[in-house]
């Protein structure tokens, strides 16, 4: 797939909705193959959100996590919010009235969640970076911090704070007994707990925050009283919420209402085509594939979608996507981590080398063919 594809220039035009990990992987491959495409995103920069939590605690790190789309994709990038997909006329409609025609559509809308783990809003690169620098200030000014949610984002957030500021009091509150993602090996989840305890994180497990809606989030206060359903009360200066990830279905919900899974993801076949549409693909978090929602998987999906657009043009057999054994690395601060590769446990040294030190930031700059700041 390294060489350019010869074809009738007017026959194929791909629109990619969403410039996350799957979207930029697909766009980069189409660009290399000289296949006409447009990438649409409401931000002007790709957000390497794998490193969002470190950008919340380490001043100066955020600028490494936002990478301009237009520098890489030039006139093939449009900043805008998708408001409708017109299946009959094969166009993507933007909020500003632009209509983008497509022969093939790749939906890569990702998922949405609370800041700082996610940054999903219409924004410039400068504003986005400043939002994270402001968050660093809130963390620096707080002595006692509560992290709500003990999935992968919550445990990584707690670890990042204690790594950067070991003197701060950090309490992690999680509604279940086991930490991190349910798909992980029990020994990996246990090691996550051990790492947090070694770092001095206070754990409140099998407890749910009962007054969450009344709490100020991401804002330093003199005293915030966090209450749980077990009657525990924690005094904090800062509350950071790391749960509630949802599929970003707003762009396509009205067009594909009958093709949606219960969580809002699009039902796809083994070729990652949306059920009933051979020219429309869903990749990444918005594809209903039985595997954890991860940047790594989104990039694998992009490979399949682009290969199948090329294969369909050349009347070749389509490539199938089969989820493999789980590879999942948890960076617990820059010097620690744990995870599994192809279903096998890997410890601190391997995870530190593979992910924890720079959180794969350099990989995204390479994908975007730019040099990091």
Curated annotation (Swiss-Prot):
The record marks 174 as: 4-hydroxy-2-nonenal adduction. One of its GO terms (biological process) is ubiquinone metabolic process. The chain crosses the membrane at residues 7-27. GO terms for cellular component: cytoplasm; cytosol; lipid droplet; mitochondrial membrane; mitochondrial outer membrane; mitochondrion; nucleus; plasma membrane. It is a lipid-anchor. It is an enzyme of class 1 (oxidoreductase). N-myristoylation at Gly-2 mediates the recruitment to lipid droplets and plasma membrane. Acetylation at Lys-168 prevents AIFM2 ubiquitination and degradation, thereby inhibiting ferroptosis. KAT2B mediates acetylation at Lys-168, while HDAC3 removes it. Keywords: Acetylation, Apoptosis, Cell membrane, Cytoplasm, FAD, Flavoprotein, Lipid droplet, Lipoprotein, Membrane, Mitochondrion, Myristate, Nucleus, Oxidoreductase, Transmembrane, Transmembrane helix, Ubl conjugation. A NAD(P)H-dependent oxidoreductase that acts as a key inhibitor of ferroptosis. At the plasma membrane, catalyzes reduction of coenzyme Q/ubiquinone-10 to ubiquinol-10, a lipophilic radical-trapping antioxidant that prevents lipid oxidative damage and consequently ferroptosis. Acts in parallel to GPX4 to suppress phospholipid peroxidation and ferroptosis. This anti-ferroptotic function is independent of cellular glutathione levels. Interacts with importin subunits KPNA2 and IPO5; this interaction likely mediates the translocation into the nucleus upon oxidative stress. This is Ferroptosis suppressor protein 1. It comes from Bos taurus.
């Amino acid at each position: 797939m390294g060489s350019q594809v010869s074809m009738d220039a007017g026959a194929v035009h791909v629109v990619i909705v969403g410039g996350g990990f799957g979207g930029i992987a697909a766009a980069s491959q189409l660009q290399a193959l000289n296949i006409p495409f447009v990438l649409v995103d409401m931000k002007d920069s790709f957000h390497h959100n794998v490193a969002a939590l470190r950008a919340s605690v380490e001043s100066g790190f955020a600028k490494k996590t936002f990478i301009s789309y237009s520098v890489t994709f030039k006139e093939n990038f449009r900043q805008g919010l998708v408001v409708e997909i017109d299946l009959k006329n094969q166009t993507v409609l933007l909020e500003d009235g632009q209509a983008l025609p497509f022969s093939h559509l790749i939906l890569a809308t990702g998922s949405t969640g609370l800041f700082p783990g996610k940054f999903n809003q219409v924004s410039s690169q400068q504003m986005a970076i400043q939002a994270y620098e402001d968050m660093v200030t809130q963390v620096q000014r707080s002595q006692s911090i509560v992290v709500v949610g003990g999935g992968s984002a919550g445990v990584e957030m707690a670890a990042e704070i204690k790594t950067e500021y070991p003197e701060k009091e950090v309490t992690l509150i999680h509604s279940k007994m086991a930490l991190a993602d349910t798909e992980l090996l029990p020994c990996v989840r246990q090691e996550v707990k051990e790492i947090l305890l070694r770092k001095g994180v206070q754990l409140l497990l099998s407890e749910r925050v009962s007054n969450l809606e009344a709490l100020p989030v991401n804002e330093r206060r003199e005293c915030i009283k966090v209450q749980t359903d077990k009657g525990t009360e924690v005094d904090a200066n800062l509350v950071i919420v790391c749960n509630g990830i949802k599929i970003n279905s707003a762009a396509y919900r009205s067009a594909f209402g009958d093709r949606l899974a219960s969580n809002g993801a699009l039902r796809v076949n083994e070729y990652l085509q949306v059920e009933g549409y051979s020219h429309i693909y869903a990749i990444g978090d918005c594809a209903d594939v039985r595997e954890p929602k991860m940047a790594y998987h989104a990039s694998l999906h992009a490979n399949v979608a682009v290969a199948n657009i090329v294969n369909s043009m050349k009347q070749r057999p389509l490539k199938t996507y089969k989820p493999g054994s789980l590879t999942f690395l948890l960076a617990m601060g820059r010097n620690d981590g744990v995870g599994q590769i192809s279903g096998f446990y890997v410890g601190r040294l391997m995870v530190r080398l593979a992910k924890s030190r720079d959180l794969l930031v350099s990989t995204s700059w390479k994908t975007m063919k730019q040099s990091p700041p």
